[in-house]
C-alpha cells in the first residue's frame, strides 16, 4: 500500500477545488484523497489492485465510498465528473526490483498511460481527470497519448522538490 507523501498531498490540494455529482479515484492507496472527495461529491468510488489498500480504506474512509478491487477503472461503466489518480511514475527497467507502488514502467509513464486510457471510458463528456506526473517521467509519451486520443492536458500545479518536480495535470476531452 502506498503511504501518503508529497505527491498525495499535492493531488489532494488540487482535487479539493473540484465539486460535482460523482468522483472516482484510481489507486486509492491510504485513502487520503478519497476522504477529501467525499466532502465535494455525492457519489464517490475508488479502485486499487492492492486488496490490502482497499481493506485499509474500508476501516478509515467515510462510508460514502464504493470500493472495487480492479485494474484502473475497468469495474465501472459510469460517467464520472472527476477522476483522480496518483499513478506510480518513477522509471524502472529492472522487473526484479520493481515496486508497483512507485515504479511506472521503463519510462515512468506506462502505468499512467494505461490509467488514462481506462479512465476516459468512465469519464463524463464534460468531466475532468487529475493525474500526478514527475519530471523523472517521460512526459512526451503522455503528450503523444493526448494527441492520439484527442485529449487536452493542462498543468494545474507544480511542486519543486530536491530531486524532482511533481505536477498535477487536468485532462479533458477536446
Regions found by a protein language model. Give the residues of each.
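Conserved SAM/SAH cofactor-binding pocket of Class I
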Residues: 4-85, 91-92
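Soluble or luminal CAZymes and related metallo-dependent hydrolases
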Residues: 7, 49, 107, 111, ...
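Conserved Class I SAM-dependent methyltransferase catalytic core
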Residues: 13, 111-170
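Glycine-rich, phosphate-binding/catalytic loops in enzymes
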Residues: 40, 99-102, 147-148
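Active-site-adjacent beta-strand anchor residues
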Residues: 47, 105, 131-132
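Short amphipathic alpha-helical segments
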Residues: 58-59, 95-98, 142-144
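Mobile active-site "lid"/loop adjacent to the S-adenosyl-L-methionine
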Residues: 87-114
Amino acid at each position: 500500500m502506498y503511504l501518503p507523501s508529497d505527491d498525495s498531498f499535492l493531488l489532494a490540494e488540487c482535487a479539493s477545488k473540484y465539486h460535482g455529482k460523482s468522483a472516482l479515484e484510481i489507486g486509492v492507496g491510504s485513502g487520503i484523497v478519497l476522504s477529501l472527495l467525499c466532502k465535494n461529491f455525492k457519489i464517490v468510488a475508488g479502485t486499487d489492485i492492492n486488496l490490502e489498500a482497499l481493506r485499509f480504506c474500508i476501516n478509515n474512509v467515510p462510508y460514502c465510498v464504493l470500493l472495487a478491487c480492479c485494474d484502473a477503472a475497468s469495474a465501472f461503466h459510469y460517467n464520472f465528473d472527476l477522476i483522480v489518480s496518483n499513478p506510480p511514475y518513477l522509471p524502472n527497467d529492472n522487473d526484479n526490483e520493481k515496486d508497483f507502488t512507485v515504479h511506472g514502467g521503463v519510462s515512468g509513464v506506462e502505468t499512467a498511460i494505461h490509467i488514462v486510457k481506462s479512465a476516459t471510458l468512465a469519464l463524463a463528456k464534460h468531466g475532468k481527470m487529475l493525474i500526478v506526473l514527475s519530471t523523472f517521467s517521460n512526459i512526451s509519451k503522455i503528450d503523444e497519448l493526448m494527441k492520439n486520443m484527442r485529449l487536452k492536458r493542462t498543468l494545474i500545479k507544480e511542486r519543486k522538490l530536491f530531486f524532482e518536480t511533481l505536477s498535477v495535470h487536468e485532462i479533458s476531452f477536446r
